[in-house]
């Protein structure tokens, strides 16, 4: 058990039958009354965000979330197949859990999966990945002064804006957090 006054950003707790991560907290001291803790939590299963106010003496059940290294193997219909790098077990994860990470995952990409017991909660990609451009317009010679960009389709199906000089079949480095082109690889 953890007191609500010990909550910090990133603290993970179990309350109301769900798993929650603390996004924000503030300690408010009232003039005559007791102190209150105003928090913002994100449900780790559904992604919904709620604001909660607690009295300073309340306690919550803290949980331990383990980060496991996994490797993306392939897509099976709608589901994604991953392999645990320690035990070599294969794990099936639904598209609702993978979410936007699928845009930057190609086969053999290593990811970190937050696990609570045997339940997968979230996927964290590496900050940068190297992907191949499969489709883009050819660059126009001499059109480099404007510093313009053009759309390019990557091997995973994602579309990113790249500089005009980048051509098809070029490997590029992409930031997975923002989806922006970083450099040629």
Swiss-Prot record:
The keyword Protein biosynthesis applies. Transmembrane segments: none annotated. Pathway: Protein biosynthesis; polypeptide chain elongation. It is found in: Cytoplasm. CDD domains: S1_EF-P_repeat_1 (cd04470), S1_EF-P_repeat_2 (cd05794). The keyword Manganese does not apply. GO terms for cellular component: cytoplasm. Its main location: cytoplasm. Involved in peptide bond synthesis. Stimulates efficient translation and peptide-bond synthesis on native or reconstituted 70S ribosomes in vitro. Probably functions indirectly by altering the affinity of the ribosome for aminoacyl-tRNA, thus increasing their reactivity as acceptors for peptidyl transferase. PANTHER family: ELONGATION FACTOR P, ELONGATION FACTOR P (EF-P) FAMILY PROTEIN. This is Elongation factor P. The lineage of its organism: Bacteria, Thermotogati, Deinococcota, Deinococci, Deinococcales. The gene is efp.
């Amino acid at each position: 058990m953890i007191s609500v006054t010990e909550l910090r950003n990133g603290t993970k707790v179990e309350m109301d039958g769900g798993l929650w991560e603390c996004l924000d907290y503030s300690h408010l001291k009232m003039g005559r009354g007791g102190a209150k803790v105003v928090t913002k939590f994100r449900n780790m299963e559904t992604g919904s965000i709620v604001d909660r106010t607690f009295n300073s003496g309340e306690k919550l059940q803290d949980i331990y979330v383990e980060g496991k290294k996994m490797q993306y193997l392939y897509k099976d219909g709608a589901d994604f197949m991953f392999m645990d790098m320690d035990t070599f077990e294969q794990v099936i994860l639904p598209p609702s859990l993978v979410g936007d990470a699928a845009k930057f995952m190609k086969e053999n990409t290593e990811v970190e999966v937050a696990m609570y017991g045997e339940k997968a909660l979230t996927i964290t990609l590496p900050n940068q990945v190297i992907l191949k451009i499969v489709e883009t317009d050819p660059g126009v010679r001499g059109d480099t002064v404007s510093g313009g960009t053009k759309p390019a389709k990557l091997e995973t199906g994602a579309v990113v804006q790249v500089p005009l000089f980048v051509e098809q079949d070029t490997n590029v480095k992409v930031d997975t957090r923002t989806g922006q082109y970083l450099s040629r690889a």
